[in-house]
Amino acid sequence: MNTGWIESTRGDFYFYHQGMSPSVAKVSEKLDEERLAIGRAYGFDLLSITGYMNQNYRAQYRNYRDFAQGSPIHNKTKGAPQSMKHRYLLEDIGHCIVPWYELGLKAGLSSPTIKAIIDLASIVSDFDYLSHRRALKAAGLSEASKEEISLVLGGTIEDDPRVLAPLSDNYANINGLETGPPVKATQVAA
């Protein structure tokens, strides 16, 4: 949604304060509504993006635009991508938005805003994200039903939604599987 800003300024703008215009925020919130609907289809009552930001930053933002304009930490530095090959596009679309879309399709949801974002990202990055989608396949779930996927995700097929809180620095127990502490990145000499 900020392709013009990114290409014209090479990232020399405040990604949230300047890039999150009223229309961009509206699209972001619509995408989030579709994400929440997908979560509900699998038995989860997920936090909205604004709710998540309020919870994690102990704030009271009314909506995503309010957050983008008012968050001191997100507006401290410009921090915008310098090109359309940035991880915000490549990773967020391929590893986040496309899996949501795949899960939505399994649940019978068309998710038109999510699909539009994927299509636009494919055009500007010269990479067809949908033809390379592999999230469900990589998880061994490409042939699974919505109900089977729901059980794997720890959701329910009954009307029993639950809120997913963000993971803390403590060990997490996800679906009965113990996970260790977060992996720390290390620098490897060339």
Name what the model sees in each region.
Residues M1-L31, V152-Y171:
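Substrate/ligand-engaging "lid" and interaction regions
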Residues N2-T9, E33, A37, H95-V98, ...:
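Generic structural signal for well-ordered, non-membrane alpha-helices
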Residues S8-F13, Y42, I73-G79:
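Short amphipathic alpha-helical segments, especially helix-boundary/capping motifs
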Residues F13-F15, F44, F67, F127:
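Phenylalanine-focused residue identity feature
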Residues V24, S28-P72:
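Small-residue-rich helix-loop
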Residues Y52-D160, P166-L167:
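Long, low-complexity C-terminal extensions of enzymes
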Residues I174-A190:
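Long, low-complexity, intrinsically disordered segments
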